[in-house]
């Protein structure tokens, strides 16, 4: 069995991250991948701050410290086990699993990877998981020609979803965020209107823009109680409430409108589908990116070497305007 020694990130406690040396053994069902690039997810940022996730099927390690961190990455297969039939050495792959991906190398099972489609640039393909998740949300949001669409949250996913809504024929795309830098980027990438809850009355603004009716579609991509409650107030009667965010703490919601106005709820979390469904959806979700219809490169705001992982996470912790921070081995 092939053995690889790798630097890998370990989170020992809140804001206590270090690189350790791990030995990866390629078992008969394993695939070893040499990383090209890794990204910090919003969930990684929460973990860094000490908010570990609840126990779910997504996590095959207990959510407790020390925690082996990382899931957004892509690279090249360098070893496969004797029972692996789906991949071979030299294949370019995208990670779809929590396998301590902040590392030079990581080990995965076949169902935790996706082939890189359309000869995508590896910088983009290495972020294939968050990109395809956001694109899946945008493509399945129910946006129709002429709709007014509000995206709550101008982070990595929100920026992609907003672009997707525009390409699907939305008449008006509104992005809501508390950071002016994110709103400026949203305008540059095609949003018609941006609103800052710290300065604007979002509910009144959306009502004014829609003659009192409300938005046809609201996508919640911020993940806060305030965002969910605002979203509930700005959707029109029989409008579409699209869930994207992963909310890991309880929130208090006013749900009377959900019933009274017959809102339609659409859950658009790709990673919670089976891996067989992801094999179908990932190429479809990434095709508009490969075609140049959705621009993701401006969303990569900061780059570090893996050796500087502490500096990268400190930036993510302190500067919410850093939309996507990436590391190279």
Model-identified regions with their sequence ranges:
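C-terminal hydrophobic helical "lid"/dimerization subdomain
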Residues: 1-4, 8, 229-232, 281-329
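N-terminal glycine-rich cofactor-binding segment
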Residues: 8-26, 42-74, 94-97, 118
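Short, surface-exposed secondary-structure boundary micro-motifs
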Residues: 36-38, 80-82, 98, 154, ...
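NAD(P)H dinucleotide-binding glycine-rich loop of Rossmann-like/cofactor-binding domains
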Residues: 59-71, 92-152
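A glycine-/small-residue-rich N-terminal strand-loop-strand element
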Residues: 74-98
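Mid-domain Rossmann-like dinucleotide-binding core that forms the NAD(H)/NADP(H) cofactor-binding site
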Residues: 124-199, 204
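Glycine-rich cofactor phosphate-binding loops and adjacent beta1-alpha1 units
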Residues: 141-143, 189-266
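C-terminal substrate-binding/catalytic core of Rossmann-like NAD(P)-dependent dehydrogenases/reductases
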Residues: 207, 252-302, 310-311
């Amino acid at each position: 069995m092939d053995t690889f020694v790798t630097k890998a990130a370990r989170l020992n406690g809140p804001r206590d991250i270090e690189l350790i040396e791990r030995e990866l053994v390629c078992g008969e069902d394993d695939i070893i991948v040499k990383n090209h690039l890794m990204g910090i997810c919003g969930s990684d940022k929460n973990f860094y701050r000490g908010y570990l996730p609840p126990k779910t099927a997504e996590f095959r390690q207990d959510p407790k410290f020390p925690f082996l961190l990382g899931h957004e990455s892509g690279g090249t297969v360098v070893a496969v086990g004797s029972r692996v039939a789906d991949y071979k050495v030299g294949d370019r792959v995208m990670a779809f699993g929590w396998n301590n991906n902040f590392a030079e190398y990581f080990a995965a099972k076949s169902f935790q990877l996706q082939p890189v489609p359309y000869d995508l640039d590896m910088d983009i393909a290495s972020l294939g998981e968050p990109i395809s998740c956001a694109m899946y949300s945008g493509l399945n949001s129910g946006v129709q020609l002429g709709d007014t669409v509000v995206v709550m949250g101008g982070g990595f996913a929100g920026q992609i979803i907003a672009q997707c809504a525009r390409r699907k024929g939305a008449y008006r795309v509104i992005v809501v965020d508390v950071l002016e830098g994110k709103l400026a980027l949203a305008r540059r990438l095609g949003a018609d209107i941006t609103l800052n809850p710290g300065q604007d009355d979002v509910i009144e603004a959306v009502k004014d823009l829609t003659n009192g009716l409300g938005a046809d579609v609201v996508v919640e991509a911020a993940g806060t109680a305030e965002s969910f409650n605002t979203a509930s107030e700005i959707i029109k009667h029989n409008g579409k409430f699209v869930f994207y965010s992963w909310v890991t703490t309880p929130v208090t919601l006013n749900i009377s409108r959900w019933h009274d106005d017959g809102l339609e709820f659409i859950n658009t979390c790709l990673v919670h589908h089976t891996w067989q469904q992801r094999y179908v959806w990932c190429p479809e979700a990434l095709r508009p990116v490969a075609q140049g219809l959705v621009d993701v490169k401006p969303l990569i705001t900061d780059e570090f070497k893996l050796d500087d992982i502490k500096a990268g996470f400190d930036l993510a912790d302190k500067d919410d305007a850093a939309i996507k921070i990436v590391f190279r081995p």
